[in-house]
Amino acid sequence: TVPGVKFGLAFSEASGPCLVRTEGNDEALVADAVRAAQAVAAGHSFYLVMKNAYPINVLTQIKACQEVARIFCATANPVQVLVASTPQGNGIVGVVDGAPPKGVESGKDRAERRAMLRTFGYKF
């Protein structure tokens, strides 16, 4: 658990009424998650939008859910979702996460990266 975390969750059903189901404690984040779910329009997918927390703070708990088969990304970067469409519907093929590399890190870059990762909760 993360004190003060705000979140919005949207889940796209793939059978029955095929609704986007929602949960959350912040209406704006729930609305963001719903927009993502509707834009991708792929059944059995969920979208979690958070603030006041990092993905690493919740990723282990999400992966431990028996209903979660795959996580395509957990990031604060801009993403593009690759969707395949068939007559039956849409399916997520993959995710483009962030931008391509611009170079190789220096010693200073490495120290800054490690300091940043420690703020996210990573341990070395």
State where each predicted segment sits.
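Conserved mixed alpha/beta catalytic, RNA-binding, or beta-rich assembly cores of soluble enzyme
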Residues: T1-R110, R114-F124
